[in-house]
Amino acid sequence: MLLPIALLLGTPGAAGAADSGKITVFAAASLREAFEAAAPAFTKKTGIAVTFNFGGSDTLAQQILQGAPADVFASANETQMKKVADAGALAGSAATFARNRLVGIVPASNPGKVASIGDFARPGVKVVLAAATVPVGGYARAAFARMNGKDGLPADFAAAVEKNVVSNELDVKAVATKISLGEGDAGVVYSTDLTPSVASKVKTLAFPPGAAPEAAYPIAALKAAPNADGAKAFVAFVLHDGQEYLKARGFISP
């Protein structure tokens, strides 16, 4: 759930000793299942409770730069992390902790008769993507651009797909939901978004070899973290013990 800025800002003077037993982690929506599964183990190990704010990495970065109190930022691409780093908001450097793959999806009934990623450009196909500023939306468009003129596709394949986009979503979970509900003919998500509830309602389509970039996920403690020690502890946990929870949900080791 993406928290409103007003709630995230909290009240002046709230930071301090009371924050030593808790942290707030701003994390890409695609990390929800893995991070929520890992949180109890982190709390058991450290005694620190975790509150998550999941959403599109671009929106989370903007909230951080607007002053929303957060201890850790976990992004689904390096672009949004760099934006926060360039503003001087990181406590040290970011580290890549996981990778992910793109996959095309269509509703199980396949009303658009989409048989391949190439069909995304066919006139009349209703494509649902994340917005271009959202990591998965950027990765998808980069993949389409790599497919221009390849394997019999037109030189303007990416532009043709863009013309078919009927909705630009705020995060990858929204894309998965719309396609699983049949509110679009085709979409692009991460392979890790194929949770049982989604996988039972969609069919998957593979990108051509070499077309789809691999998503890199960086994580970092934030300079203005209310609980600096807790932030460092969570980052260390994700880079080590937390890897088993990421792998169990389909993420690739960094």
What do the PLM-derived regions correspond to, one by one?
Residues 1-12:
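Bacterial N-terminal signal peptides
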Residues 15-58, 62-68, 75-78, 82-90, ...:
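Exported/periplasmic ABC-transporter solute-binding proteins
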